[in-house]
C-alpha cells in the first residue's frame, strides 16, 4: 500500500512539474518552432517508472489547455510512447534518450499537416528534432543522471512497475501476519537493495 501511494504521488508530482514548466514557458513551448523544457522530464522513467504516467498526464494537460486538439492527440501519444520506450531501454548505455528524440520529431509535425497548415513536414521534423536534442540530451540527460545520484544518496526509494502493482498483496500479507514489513518498507539504496533488483536501476 505504501509503495502504491508513493507511486501515485510521484506520478502526480511529475505531472505538476511538467505542466508548470509548460505554463511558465508557454510562448516557447508550443508551435512549429518550440523549446519545451518540460520534455526533459521524459527521461525520468530510467529510474522512476511512475514518471511515465506523470509526463503523459502533464503533456496531455499542457496540450489541452494551451494547444490544439491535434496536439493533444499526437503530442501526448509521442510523449507517452517515448516514456515507455525510455523505461524499456533503461539498461542500455544512453540509448534510452533516443525515443523522445525520434518519436517527437516524427509525430509532432503531423499536427500541422492534419491541421491543414502549409508548413513543410520535413522542415518541422528538423526543427522539432533540433529542439529535442537540446532539451533531452543537453539538459534532460545530465539532470536525470544527477537527480538519480542525489536521490540514491538520500536513500529515496525507487520502485519498478511490478513492485508497485504488487504492493496491495504485500500489505494484505503483512496485515495477516504472513510477511515481515520491515524489509518491504525499508528505503532502497545502492547498498541495501537486493541483488535481483539492482538491475532495475541500471
Regions found by a protein language model. Name each.
Residues 1-53:
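Hydrophobic transmembrane alpha-helices
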Residues 1-4, 56, 118, 122:
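Juxtamembrane loop-helix boundary motifs flanking transmembrane segments in multi-pass membrane proteins
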Residues 18, 55-63:
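Small-polar-interrupted transmembrane alpha-helices in polytopic inner-membrane proteins
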Residues 27-32, 60-188, 199-200:
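Membrane-embedded alpha-helical hairpins and interfacial helices in multi-pass inner-membrane proteins
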Amino acid at each position: 500500500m505504501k509503495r502504491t501511494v508513493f507511486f501515485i504521488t510521484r506520478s502526480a508530482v511529475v505531472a505538476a512539474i511538467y505542466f508548470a514548466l509548460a505554463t511558465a514557458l508557454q510562448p516557447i513551448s508550443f508551435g512549429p518552432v518550440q523549446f519545451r523544457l518540460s520534455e526533459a522530464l521524459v527521461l525520468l522513467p530510467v529510474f522512476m517508472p511512475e514518471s511515465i504516467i506523470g509526463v503523459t498526464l502533464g503533456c496531455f494537460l499542457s496540450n489541452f489547455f494551451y494547444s490544439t486538439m491535434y496536439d493533444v492527440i499526437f503530442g501526448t501519444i509521442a510523449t507517452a510512447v517515448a516514456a515507455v520506450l525510455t523505461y524499456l531501454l533503461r539498461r542500455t548505455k544512453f540509448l534510452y534518450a533516443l525515443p523522445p528524440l525520434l518519436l517527437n520529431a516524427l509525430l509532432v509535425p503531423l499536427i500541422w499537416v492534419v491541421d491543414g497548415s502549409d508548413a513543410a513536414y520535413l522542415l518541422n521534423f528538423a526543427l522539432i528534432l533540433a529542439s529535442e536534442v537540446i532539451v533531452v540530451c543537453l539538459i534532460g540527460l545530465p539532470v536525470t543522471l544527477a537527480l538519480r545520484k542525489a536521490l540514491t544518496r538520500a536513500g529515496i526509494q525507487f520502485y519498478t512497475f511490478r513492485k508497485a502493482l504488487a504492493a496491495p498483496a504485500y500489505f494484505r500479507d503483512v496485515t495477516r501476519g504472513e510477511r515481515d514489513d520491515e524489509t518491504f518498507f525499508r528505503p532502497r539504496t545502492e547498498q541495501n537493495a537486493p541483488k535481483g533488483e539492482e538491475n532495475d536501476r541500471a
